[in-house]
């Protein structure tokens, strides 16, 4: 795949040679199987995604606020090896892999959506908005394929990739407010808006709005993630994370309103100046097999929850920086999360520049606990 | 490479509190109404009581009650309440399902509800079932009334209304109190006090919601007192008890929803008891539903109710006359739920983000800094020429 790129042994990151990620010593492996991915960007990582295709050697891509996009591949030494990098002249707000993992869509804060072809290592602008592009998702439907982008310009746009390099817009949906988060699990798409409403779309035969749900959360929505039903076949609902340290689990077609609920998370254990501090929930991911979810927050912890049993499975120890984004591999074996400053305390709060990427083996941690009777 | 400003390590830290994160939040723990006795939390290893022990103890008690003579029937309910106290002491936390099953086993005995339908001590039984029904308190109390248990006990309706209010169904809470009046529950003062307290708390909630929306300018318009807006989907309005309305006995009581009428029919009409029974309970599906209702996880967020002093209610259901909020008091050894004479001292919470981010996302803020964002020092990306590639 990368043979034609001509990189060879050329240095990729910061002038240093390509090196494998650092594995923790054996003494720590028995206690903690986490390991760091070498070559994390120098600025906050906004998005991190595993490649969608289940492979023997999964790939990992991340986009950061300094416009850096990097791709790693899991090598034979069981570490992630840096493979490619691109520099975009704007913060990266979202990325989306194409289904065969050969290309990456990039949502940028400079109002453009780009396509990075990994084989040729070239980038093209494939869509534009009137405001920063907040989300991008590749829709691989039964009858069509397109790129869905959501923006702060209050529009949701769908782009055709067949006529490149021409930008072909297939559809545009005018929204009442800015797009803050979105997720796609065909045939369902959910879009969270700044007015705390969630638009639900049916993507079969084109996007069709099927529901407009008011969020159960009182504060700004920060992330959203779709989950499947108990048979793990079809999308059934979504989980919302807010800046108030609370997550809402919402079913789209709810038979019993009591199935929808919210729970608190990512709050300080001790009092700080007499107050319990509430942190933002920065990202939510569902385990593809178990159906459990992991939340990451500005408090530097990740927590794993079983939404069906409404119990918490695990909480990590606090990390020295906020956790900004996470993803679970399609095999369910790995959880990747990024550390970095998330701007929650403004520009002056950025006291620790840089970022870290940690891989955590999660197949056992996120397994639902058996019910005792 | 430059030296890292801090030493990052993935070594596991000693954080004992992490294991109990779930229990730290008061909404995730449903305490008993009167708190937990401190002795019950200081368990010795040899005194550990298991689920099987509790089941066996109840079976023995029920067998013993079967052999009681008729003259000792008044002791039967007291022994059951003693068993409940024992259970709450020995199996304080984490046995809500077992407790509900055992309580259901008690009330489902033949003739039990009919025998004690006027005994106010049954209020404790219903309260315990409601508290351990995984958030289905409304159904439990409704079932009690449908079986004509404590139909005329005003304290039951007050407790029922309070539990519904805790679930956030304020309109339904009002309906419960209306049902109390329709059923001629006594003493009426309890119903009046509960109603006043409910409206007071409702006003306080509205004021707090208004205070939290400081940036919004609400245009207030005055409306005629008789043109109050409806609340919720039903055509009901807030209860306003004018002196003239209270003394007027000729007007009919407000009607309920059809669903409520079908399930809970009043036994009193025009302030007089009906000459014959008008309610016949034949829906067996309800019984089967309630038998296993504790398996349905209806997670309802609870928050403290700062009740006004109401000795009538507390006196009917508890031996203590304290009318304050029950809240957790943490210490270095264990966490004890207790009733304090002073007001609650629960720590306040605040969001650890800048105020501007309540309305503006982090990414919007970063995008607004462009092109002067400190991260933007890179060159423009190269454009792709597909024609050249082909």
UniProtKB/Swiss-Prot annotation, chain A:
One of its GO terms (molecular function) is RNA binding. Keywords: Acetylation, Cell projection, mRNA transport, Nuclear pore complex, Nucleus, Protein transport, Repeat, Synapse, Translocation, Transport, WD repeat. Expressed along the ventral and dorsal nerve cords. It is found in: Nucleus, Nuclear pore complex; Nucleus; Cell projection, Axon; Synapse. PROSITE patterns: WD_REPEATS_1, WD_REPEATS_2, WD_REPEATS_REGION. One of its GO terms (biological process) is protein transport. GO terms for cellular component: axon; nuclear pore; synapse. InterPro entries: G-protein_beta_WD-40_rep, WD40/YVTN_repeat-like_dom_sf, WD40_repeat_CS, WD40_repeat_dom_sf, WD40_rpt. WD repeats lie at residues 40-82, 87-126, 128-169, 276-315. The modification N-acetylmethionine is found at residue 1. Belongs to the WD repeat rae1 family. The nuclear pore complex (NPC) constitutes the exclusive means of nucleocytoplasmic transport. NPCs allow the passive diffusion of ions and small molecules and the active, nuclear transport receptor-mediated bidirectional transport of macromolecules such as proteins, RNAs, ribonucleoparticles (RNPs), and ribosomal subunits across the nuclear envelope. Interacts with rpm-1. This is mRNA export factor rae-1. The gene is rae-1.
């Amino acid at each position: 795949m990368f043979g034609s790129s001509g990189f060879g042994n050329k240095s990729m990151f910061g002038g240093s040679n390509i090196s494998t990620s650092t594995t923790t010593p054996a003494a720590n492996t028995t206690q903690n199987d986490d390991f760091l991915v070498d070559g994390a960007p120098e600025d906050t990582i906004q998005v991190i995604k595993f490649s969608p295709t289940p492979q023997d050697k999964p790939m990992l891509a991340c986009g950061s606020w300094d416009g850096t996009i990097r791709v790693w591949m899991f090598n034979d030494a069981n570490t992630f090896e840096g493979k490619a990098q691109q520099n975009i002249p704007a913060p990266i707000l979202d990325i989306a892999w194409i289904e065969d993992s050969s290309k990456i869509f990039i949502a940028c804060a400079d109002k453009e959506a780009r396509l990075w072809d990994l084989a040729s290592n070239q980038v093209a602008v494939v869509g534009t908005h009137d405001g920063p592009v907040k989300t991008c998702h590749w829709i691989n439907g039964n009858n069509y394929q397109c790129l869905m982008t959501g923006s702060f310009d209050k529009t949701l746009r769908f782009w055709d990739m067949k006529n490149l390099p021409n930008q072909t817009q297939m559809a545009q949906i005018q929204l009442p407010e800015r797009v803050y988060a979105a997720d796609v699990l065909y045939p369902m798409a959910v879009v969270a808006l700044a007015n705390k409403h969630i638009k639900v779309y049916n993507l079969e035969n084109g996007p069709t709005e099927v529901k407009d749900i008011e969020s159960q959360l009182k504060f700004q929505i920060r992330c959203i993630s779709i989950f499947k039903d108990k048979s793990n076949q079809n999308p059934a609902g979504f989980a919302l994370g807010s800046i108030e340290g609370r997550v809402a689990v919402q079913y789209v077609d709810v038979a019993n309103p009591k199935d929808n609920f919210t729970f608190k998370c990512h709050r300080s254990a001790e009092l700080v100046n007499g107050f319990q501090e509430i942190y933002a929930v920065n990202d939510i991911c569902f385990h593809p097999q178990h159906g459990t979810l992991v939340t990451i927050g500005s408090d530097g912890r990740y927590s794993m929850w079983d939404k069906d049993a409404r119990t918490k499975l695990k909480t990590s120890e606090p990390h020295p920086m906020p956790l900004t984004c996470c993803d679970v591999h399609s095999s369910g074996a790995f959880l990747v999360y990024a550390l970095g400053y998330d701007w929650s305390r403004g520009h002056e709060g950025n006291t620790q520049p840089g970022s870290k990427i940690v891989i955590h083996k999660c197949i056992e941690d996120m397994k639902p606990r058996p019910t005792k009777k | 490479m430059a030296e890292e400003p801090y030493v990052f390590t993935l070594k596991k830290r000693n954080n004992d509190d992490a294991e109990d994160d779930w229990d730290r939040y008061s909404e995730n723990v449903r305490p008993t109404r009167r708190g937990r006795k401190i002795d019950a939390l200081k368990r010795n290893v040899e005194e550990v009581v298991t689920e099987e022990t509790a089941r066996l103890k109840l079976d023995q008690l029920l067998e013993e009650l079967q052999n009681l003579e008729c003259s000792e029937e008044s002791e039967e309910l007291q022994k059951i309440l003693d068993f409940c106290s024992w259970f709450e002491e020995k199996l304080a936390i984490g046995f809500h399902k077992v407790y509900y099953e055992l309580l259901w086993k008690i009330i489902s005995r033949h003739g039990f509800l009919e025998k004690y339908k006027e005994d106010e001590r049954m209020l404790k039984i219903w309260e315990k079932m409601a508290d351990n029904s995984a958030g289905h308190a409304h159904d439990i109390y409704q079932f009690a009334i449908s079986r004509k248990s404590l139909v005329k006990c005003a304290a039951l309706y007050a407790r029922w209304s309070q539990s519904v209010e805790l679930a956030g169904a304020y309109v339904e809470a009002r309906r419960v109190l209306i049902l109390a009046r329709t059923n001629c529950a006594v003493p009426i003062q309890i119903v009046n006090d509960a109603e006043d307290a409910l409206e007071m708390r409702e006003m306080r909630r509205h004021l707090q919601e208004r205070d939290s929306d400081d940036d919004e300018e609400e245009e207030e318009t005055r409306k005629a007192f008789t043109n109050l807006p409806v609340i919720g989907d039903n055509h009901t309005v807030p209860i306003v008890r004018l002196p003239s309305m209270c003394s007027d006995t000729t007007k009919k009581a407000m009607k309920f929803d059809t669903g409520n009428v079908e399930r809970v029919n009043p036994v009193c009409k025009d302030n007089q008891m009906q000459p014959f029974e008008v309610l016949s309970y034949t829906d067996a599906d309800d019984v089967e539903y309630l038998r296993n209702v504790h398996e349905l996880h209806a997670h309802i967020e609870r928050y403290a109710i700062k009740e006004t002093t109401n000795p009538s209610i507390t006196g009917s259901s508890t031996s203590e006359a304290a009318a304050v909020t029950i809240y957790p008091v943490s210490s270095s050894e264990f966490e004890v739920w207790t009733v304090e004479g002073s007001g609650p001292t629960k720590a306040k919470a605040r969001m650890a983000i800048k105020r501007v981010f309540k309305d503006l996302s982090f990414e919007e803020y970063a995008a607004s800094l462009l092109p002067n964002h400190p991260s933007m020092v890179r060159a423009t990306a190269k454009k792709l020429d597909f024609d050249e590639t082909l």
